[in-house]
């Protein structure tokens, strides 16, 4: 990959750690992550029926393989996965939860979009989802 995106680089590095599957549900804000997964050699994109199932699948994978990746979309997706993600944290399982967010352009222009509460507080869900994470970071 010449000039990889942040998503491609992140997924490639996690793949180098031996994680060969990423579990999740396609979502419009996560399409860049979903597309990047298709570009990483040896990484299988496992599409799940819903975000909670994806989180539980990642939890099970981490129990067997040592670490896992999960991807969801902003807001409704990340909140739907939270019970599985919190369970992984409780059992000290390294599950990397990658959440696709509205673009910088949308955030800078303060555009009201779907998956929010009718306002432009794009970090509203970070404290909630972040409580289920060992570490959080916003990558652009």
Write out the residue ranges for each language-model feature:
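N-terminal alpha/beta PP-like core and its mobile active-site loop of ThDP/TPP-dependent enzymes
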Residues: 1-140
């Amino acid at each position: 990959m010449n000039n990889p995106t942040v998503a491609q680089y992140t997924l490639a590095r996690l793949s180098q750690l031996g994680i060969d599957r990423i579990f999740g549900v396609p979502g419009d804000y996560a399409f860049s992550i979903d597309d990047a997964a298709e570009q990483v050699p040896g990484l299988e994109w496992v599409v799940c029926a819903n975000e909670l199932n994806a989180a539980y699948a990642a939890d099970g994978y981490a129990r067997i393989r040592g670490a896992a990746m999960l991807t969801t979309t902003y807001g409704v997706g990340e909140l739907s996965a939270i019970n599985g993600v919190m369970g992984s944290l409780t059992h000290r399982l390294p599950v990397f939860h990658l959440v696709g967010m509205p673009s910088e352009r949308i955030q800078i222009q303060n555009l009201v979009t779907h998956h929010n509460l009718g306002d432009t507080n794009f970090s509203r869900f970070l404290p909630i989802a972040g409580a289920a994470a060992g570490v959080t970071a916003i990558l652009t």
